A protein has these predicted regions:
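Loop/helix patches that line or flank the sugar-binding groove of alpha-linked glycan CAZymes
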Residues: 65, 81, 128, 146, ...
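N-terminal structural segment of carbohydrate-active enzymes
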Residues: 57-189, 197-199, 204-207, 219-220, ...
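Alpha-amylase-like alpha-glycosidases and glucanotransferases acting on alpha-linked glucans and related
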Residues: 61-70, 154, 164-180, 205-324, ...
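Short, solvent-exposed turn/loop segments enriched in Gly/Ser/Thr/Pro and often Arg
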Residues: 74-77, 119-130, 193-203, 328-334, ...
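Solvent-exposed beta-strand/loop surfaces of large extracellular or lumenal domains
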Residues: 588-604
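C-terminal beta-strand-rich structural cap/linker in extracellular carbohydrate-active enzymes
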Residues: 601-621
């Protein structure tokens, strides 16, 4: 979810969050080790390599044989074949993808990228300006909806799916269940969002099971806080809807009013009847038993009603076949809740995974250990450091990579989810980020190999989607809108009218997708990546602060990763191969895995490394 400044999470301040296809490979830029097991070496971008031990990474108690590779997509956007793209356009004008659009062919295309989890974003019924009152769904007020399609993170019914995504609205849940079944049939697992911190101001469940009580139905609205309330209130004051003073096509639907008296606290911890336009004004903060306005005093015994309601919601979707939950703004919910709820839900399915959207490195370990999360975002840290390198910013430095695994996530790097794109972040190919998707390839390699945790792609990333244009509420913000009905141009070329064969992609887009495919083929099953330790490699020659090398190794495999983020300088160096490495062989056969080129390195020599700017190699020997 898009972030704003000044948020606190569980009493701890969070950092704010703002919202040429040339790959030159040198056949000689290889570093060899001798082993009686298979070896894997990945070389990136002009780099010199000499292996010495450094900080060892903590091993898992359980050995894994496959890396989790997640593919995030919004069904509303993913299957939309309409190319009209009118800013603020209606669903009739701009169209919407459906659950049914995610066909067997689509899933096969996703699986080609060596994906094993699909994160379906925006599944749950959320506030929207499209009228489904004919189906018994109460219309939403335009004054508290962002965009015409609405934010997928302003949930209006936790027991329903978004009617936009159904061909037959009456059977929308059955269409979602069929998608889950199709996904599982392809040996893929299903992730959906769990948004625990807030709900839409219009929250009302039309489809809740019997005996389920809506949020706020039994609240005492005369008090600002009660441990038994679901919401926080501003007694005696009605809500004042914010405005930015700008006219849009949606202005005719807005009257500047929303009937909420007393006003409820806003989702980003704003305890005021007059939230600002930049606040999450369309949402209501849920009460987990923390009195934020009185020294954040906690009331967790007896169990707060919201805890019980949220447990039941998670179990409901687990019974639908969901295999895991990406938990929105996990740090804005008390650790005690996660410690309580995750084990309970895992009693229903022990193989469930919980991924926390997290931005405060100071509490990462706490949310993993006490909070029981399986994985956390590595946004503040690796993503931010890699983005600086990709953008060629003056303060970019590979020491940020070193800091991540040696300090920030030392001992739990395999619990960190690495990515370069998601719905909150700028598209790599956007003008504000890199301007060219290929410039991020060394960073993608580092993301996929630095730890054994999950790696994630955002749909369209693999074909260089630029997130360009004025979409509506999303604006021209270098992202693909999550608030509007929209077609995603580069992705639509791969979709090719539902054939999902990529025949409309140009050569550069096809090459980019193939690169992602080959890289993840190599890394997703690498024992060194999944279960190995990590060593930093000191280098010589002309290496600078835009070049980095490290080794991932296990008893079965060793992996050398060399990355050159420098846009201009070719890396040139000689690597001295120690005698003990090559003493059993007169030469070392190697295979460059991205091209399947087979090479031999003579024994007892220095190996010249020559790698062009922004290039990579994957070499097995």
């Amino acid at each position: 979810m898009r972030k704003v400044k000044g948020i606190k999470a569980d009493g701890i301040g969070l950092k704010s969050k703002t919202l040429s296809d040339r790959r030159c490979y040198s056949a000689q830029s290889l570093f060899a080790f001798e082993s009686n097991k298979s070896w894997l070496l990945i070389l990136f971008f002009n780099f010199i390599i000499i292996p010495i031990s450094s900080f060892a990474q903590k091993k898992r108690t359980k050995m894994n044989d496959k890396q989790i590779v997640i593919y995030q997509l919004l069904p509303r956007l993913f299957g939309n074949k309409n190319t009209t793209n009118i800013p603020y356009g209606t669903i009739q004008q701009n169209g919407s993808g459906k659950f049914n659009d995610i066909t067997d062919k689509a899933l096969d295309g996703i699986k080609e990228l060596h994906v094993n989890y699909v994160w379906y974003t925006g599944v749950l019924a959320h506030a929207s300006l499209t009228d489904y009152s004919a189906y018994g769904i109460k219309p939403d007020d335009a004054d508290v909806v962002k965009g015409r399609a609405g934010s997928p993170y302003a949930i209006r019914d936790y027991y329903d799916v978004d009617p936009d995504l159904a061909v037959d609205v009456k059977n929308r849940m059955k269409e979602f269940e069929a998608l889950v079944k199709r996904t599982h049939a392809k040996n893929l697992k299903v992730l959906i969002d769990f948004i625990p911190n807030h709900v839409a101001r219009s929250y009302h469940s039309d489809t809740k099971p019997k005996n389920v009580i809506d949020f706020g139905a039994n609240d005492d609205v005369t008090v600002a806080f009660s441990p038994r309330n679901d919401f926080y209130y501003i007694p005696g004051q009605p809500l004042v809807v914010p405005t930015n003073g700008q006219k849009t096509p949606l202005s005719v639907l807005q009257d500047g009013k929303f009937d909420e008296n007393p006003a409820k606290a806003t989702g980003n911890n704003v305890f005021s009847a007059q939230p600002k336009y930049d606040d999450w004004y369309e949402t209501i903060k849920l009460n987990y038993g923390v009195d934020y306005q009185n020294s954040e005093k906690q009331y967790f015994d007896p169990i707060p009603p919201v805890w019980l309601k949220m447990r039941d919601i998670l179990i409901f979707w687990t019974h639908k076949g969901v295999d895991g939950f990406r938990c929105d703004m996990a740090e804005m919910v008390p650790i005690a809740f996660w410690n309580w709820v995750i084990p309970q839900v895992k009693k229903v399915n022990p193989d469930l995974i919980f991924i926390g959207e997290a931005y405060n490195p100071k509490v990462y370990k706490q949310y993993l250990d006490e909070g029981k999360f399986d994985y956390l975002y590595d946004k503040v840290g690796l993503y931010d450091g890699l983005k600086r390198l990709i953008r060629n910013e003056p303060n970019a430095d590979v020491k940020d990579i070193r800091f991540i695994w040696q300090q920030e996530s030392a001992g739990f790097g395999h619990h960190m989810l690495r990515f370069l794109e998601n719905h909150d972040e700028e598209r790599i190919a956007s003008a504000a980020f890199a301007g060219k998707a290929e410039l991020a390839l060394p960073a993608m390699v580092v993301s996929a190999t630095l730890g054994g945790g999950p790696v994630m792609l955002y749909f369209g990333q693999e074909v260089g989607e630029p997130g360009k244009g004025q979409e509506g509420f999303g604006g021209d913000d270098n992202r693909t809108t999550i608030f509007d009905y929209w077609g995603v141009p580069n992705h639509q070329k791969w979709m090719n009218g539902g054939l999902f064969d990529g025949h409309k992609l140009n050569g550069a887009q096809q090459n980019l997708r193939n690169y992602y495919k080959q890289l993840l083929k190599v890394t997703s099953k690498s024992d060194a990546v999944l279960n190995g330790k990590i060593y930093e490699v000191p280098v010589t020659g002309n290496m600078n602060n835009r070049m980095y090398a490290f080794i991932r190794y296990s008893g079965k495999q060793r992996l050398l990763v060399v990355a050159n983020f420098d846009r201009n300088q070719t890396l040139s160096a000689n690597i001295e191969i120690p005698d003990q490495v090559l003493k059993a062989k007169s030469s070392v056969p190697v295979t460059e895995l991205l091209t399947d080129k087979k090479l031999n390195i003579p024994a007892g020599t220095n190996i010249p490394v020559t790698l062009a700017p922004v290039s990579a190699q994957v070499i097995e020997f």
